[in-house]
Amino acid sequence: MELYCTRPACPRPLNLFSDLDDPATLKRVPQKYCTTCGMPLILADRYIPLKLLGQGGFGAAFLARDRYTPTMRQCVVKLFQPSGNLNPQQLQTAQNLFEREAEVLEELGNQHPQIPDLFAFFQLTVPSLQPGKQEQFFYLVQEFINGENLEEEFTKNGKFSEAQILEILQQILPVLQFVHAHGSIHRDIKPSNIMRSRKGALFLLDFGAVKQVTKVAASSASSTGIYSMGYAPPEQMSGGQIYPSTDLYALAVTCLTLLTGKQPNELFDTYNNQWNWRTYAQVSPRLANILDRMLLSSPNQRYHSADEVLAALTLPPPAPPVQTTA
């Protein structure tokens, strides 16, 4: 069985242990250590990382198994390990965001079927690769969603149809309605953060940038600047106050990129400060108008809530004009 070392600096993270092919041994073995760097491989005595799923500036995500469940269920282990060029204030901000993600997943994910559940959050202190020093690692463990994100779907299948976009809106807007009702704003909606499970349900992922609405006014002057370029609206990019409509804007940009096959910077006219996307997509005037309103630069002019967008989507289409004869 292959186990993956979660130490970011490990030069050879893959470890093969043939004795762990036996499930009984896997369940009772006290610990296994990386044969290259000595890092403990079984995390919190139960989570067994198998492979790297992805990594970014603040850490990495691993596919793992929980050996204390009857089926040794799959899960995702996220490691917080930011890049080494952060100053102490930036490092603390990054750590706070990681802890916030765990808090939000515990509060929201365990209550909503389209947000991953949180299973664990813990710290591990181990000897550093530098003699005489210690390293601290922070982990969270969450539900594994077996499927593809919308970015992967687009890469495989090409542009989305209007019917597919309507399905995305009808599935994700109720999730946002739930998130906003619990006092949070996601702040990082984009195709790669929406995952479709094998059963077809859409999940909202990556709550690392979430912000509590109740704390926005007090902290807006010192925004952390966490956003994805092109998907974030003006108020978020300028570090100003954010709203539920901030997420609606990002969801609309997500829809545009999937409809047109173009990146946000190819669709936004910076000279005239407007979105020019309609010539690249064939959609009904009704959907186009809804997306355009979600994309208005002023938060006050957009729909104020996910409820309002859902209501606009469910309204009957206007009746055709009646032609009268003189």
Language-model region placement:
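Activation segment signature within eukaryotic-like protein kinase domains
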Residues: 168-169
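Protein kinase glycine-rich loop
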Residues: 50-57, 61
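Catalytic-loop of the protein kinase fold
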Residues: 180-196
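Activation segment
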Residues: 209-210
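AlphaC helix of the protein kinase catalytic domain
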Residues: 149-160
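Short beta-strand micro-motifs within the conserved protein kinase catalytic domain, predominantly
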Residues: 117-138
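Conserved activation segment of eukaryotic-like protein kinases, specifically the C-terminal portion
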Residues: 219-235
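AlphaC helix of the eukaryotic protein kinase fold
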Residues: 88-109
